[in-house]
């Protein structure tokens, strides 16, 4: 019996592939407004500080390929064909949907490489994909909305946190705090009833419980440079505040809203947060990001299959 063929649309933010892409990439993020020379110079400096253009593009591609491989390995009913769609650079989400349509894919499942739902992120990715599919007359698309509660995802982070705490001296362990963070979004999402902040808190609760950590908080990072208020506290301010109020001597940063090594982690955490801990004379720890770790890829595969089972697929 031949297997059913299904498109696997993996969506992510996207990143410049080379330095020449910086301007058009950030122009797209800024809805067509070109970044100033100062902004571009600042961005170049940040990328240089992390060793050149972020590794995100290669990691995202690897995550998507490994996910398709894993899905085809663990079940025999469906043959998944992977299509990668990015938010701010080619292949855009629409390009991927168009490619599926041209390849004769009639049904597809989408997943965004971001664990939490928000109107600004996951909703906009899935909205763009559905809109393009409707415009073309196919494929029929079912979308994963969030996956932060997946036990295997929580286990990935809990295992890394346990390893990190095990590497500390006893004194550090007793005086350590875990900061679980995600990308800040404009504060107005709270008034809109967006579940994003609550989902980050739940993620932190799950990870801390599984890792056996009692001292933990959530923080926000990488806020945009706009006049409107963004979700806080920012992780750098939070680090100073926790040090002053509680006297912690070791800070463990888990940027659980992200899934790979990229500018927001390699610069905003590993450089900016570390500058703060160095200034305070305390220890900085940041467990490895999921990237294409088999444990994380298996978590994503489980999310996709569980979603399809709920949609009535016989798997």
UniProtKB/Swiss-Prot annotation:
Protein name, entry field: Coproporphyrin III ferrochelatase
Residues noted as binding Fe(2+) in the record, renumbered to the chain: 183, 264
Catalytic activity annotation: Fe-coproporphyrin III + 2 H(+) = coproporphyrin III + Fe(2+)
Record-linked Pfam families: Ferrochelatase
GO CC annotation, single: cytoplasm
Function: Involved in coproporphyrin-dependent heme b biosynthesis. Catalyzes the insertion of ferrous iron into coproporphyrin III to form Fe-coproporphyrin III.
Any one GO MF annotation of this record: metal ion binding
Compartments (UniProt record): Cytoplasm
Keywords of this entry: Cytoplasm, Heme biosynthesis, Iron, Lyase, Metal-binding, Porphyrin biosynthesis
CDD domains linked: Ferrochelatase_C, Ferrochelatase_N
């Amino acid at each position: 019996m031949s297997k059913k063929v299904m498109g696997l649309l993996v969506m992510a933010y996207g990143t410049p592939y080379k330095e020449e892409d910086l301007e058009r990439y950030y122009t797209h993020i800024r809805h067509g407004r070109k970044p100033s020379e100062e902004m571009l110079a600042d961005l170049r400096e940040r990328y240089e500080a992390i060793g050149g253009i972020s590794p995100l593009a290669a990691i995202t591609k690897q995550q998507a390929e490994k996910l398709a491989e894993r899905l085809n390995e663990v079940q025999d009913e469906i043959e998944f064909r992977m299509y990668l769609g990015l938010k701010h650079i080619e292949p855009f989400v629409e390009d991927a949907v168009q490619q599926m349509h041209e390849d004769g894919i009639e049904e597809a499942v989408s997943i965004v490489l971001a664990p939490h739902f928000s109107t600004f992120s996951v909703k906009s990715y899935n909205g763009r994909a559905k809109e393009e599919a409707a415009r073309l007359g196919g494929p029929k698309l079912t979308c994963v909305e969030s996956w932060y509660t997946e036990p295997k995802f929580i286990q990935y982070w809990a295992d890394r946190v346990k390893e990190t705490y095990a590497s500390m001296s006893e004194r550090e362990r007793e005086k350590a705090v875990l900061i679980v963070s995600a990308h800040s979004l404009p504060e107005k999402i709270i008034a809109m009833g967006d579940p994003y902040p609550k989902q980050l808190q739940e993620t932190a609760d799950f990870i801390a419980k599984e890792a056996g950590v009692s001292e933990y908080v959530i923080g926000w990072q990488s806020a945009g440079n706009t006049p409107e208020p963004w979700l806080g506290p920012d992780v750098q301010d939070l680090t100073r505040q926790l040090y002053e109020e509680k006297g912690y001597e070791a800070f463990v940063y888990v940027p659980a809203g992200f899934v790979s090594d990229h500018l927001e982690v390699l610069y905003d955490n590993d450089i900016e947060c570390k500058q703060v801990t160095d200034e305070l004379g305390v220890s900085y720890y940041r467990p490895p990001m999921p990237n294409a770790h088999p444990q994380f890829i298996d978590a994503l595969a489980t999310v996709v299959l569980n979603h399809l089972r709920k949609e009535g697929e016989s798997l």
